[in-house]
């Protein structure tokens, strides 16, 4: 793209407002919930550039941001947090998938769409849906419905969870565990956790990505159950690089100032990610999902949210 085409694009006031809003999200003045609302507002007004692939940009930026967060994670603490909560991670996944099957049958809802919503709730939202969809031969509308449902609930979680955490006077660690278990997408997990505090963010990111590793066995089992193609699995590569970033920071501690900078920059780019996610949500998309998938999503979300919270507060 040459300079003349860039300047011609900036003559469009809506495009210029969108770019300025995106840049504002990289400043300390913009919080994660504010960024999401700002993106949603611009999308509702029709001010999102239609020739930009927002979804692809969000996916790449989110991956790079999560890798950057890895440089701020202590390896020993990460192993301890993941191993200490392994039972909760596995139990929550199995519980959500079984409950999803039961509720889908009770609602007489499409089994493939129901399984996608349950997988997204059980593991890591849109990434899990994207990985499981080809494994179960899901159609485009089934995948879109599941994604729309998860995105709506993610948006609510970004505001609801920090408020509930403060209301319940949860510690940074406990809130990090709870958000990692009960919020769908990694982006909303880190958004809610970063709003609560840095320690909550580090705990939540570590446990969420440990949970995300279960995409692989769940996608394989889903392919066997639904007769899909195991060769079409779409697995998020950034998890491995996130683990590598943690290892590098542990093995080469002499570069700690650089790691601190990467961690802080990644926190700001995550806010930008939430702005872009908001820019991809419209009222039309929310209405298109209909009542049944949203009802299923809410039931599963409330079940995993309440049970995991009770476990963390009273049994951990």
UniProtKB/Swiss-Prot annotation:
A single Gene Ontology CC term: plasma membrane
Transmembrane feature ranges = 61-80, 85-107, 114-136, 146-168, 175-197, 207-226, 233-252, 262-281, 293-315
Q: Name one Pfam family in it.
A: Cons_hypoth698
Domain of life of the source: Bacteria
Report the locations given in the UniProt record: Cell membrane
UniProt main location, coarse: membrane
> How the protein sits in the membrane?
Multi-pass membrane protein
Alphabetically sorted, this entry's keywords are:
Cell membrane, Membrane, Transmembrane, Transmembrane helix
**Translocase recorded as keyword:** no
What family is reported?
Answer: Belongs to the UPF0324 family.
Name by which UniProt lists this protein? UPF0324 membrane protein SO_4708
Q: Which organism is it from?
A: Shewanella oneidensis (strain ATCC 700550 / JCM 31522 / CIP 106686 / LMG 19005 / NCIMB 14063 / MR-1)
The root-end lineage is: Bacteria, Pseudomonadati, Pseudomonadota, Gammaproteobacteria, Alteromonadales
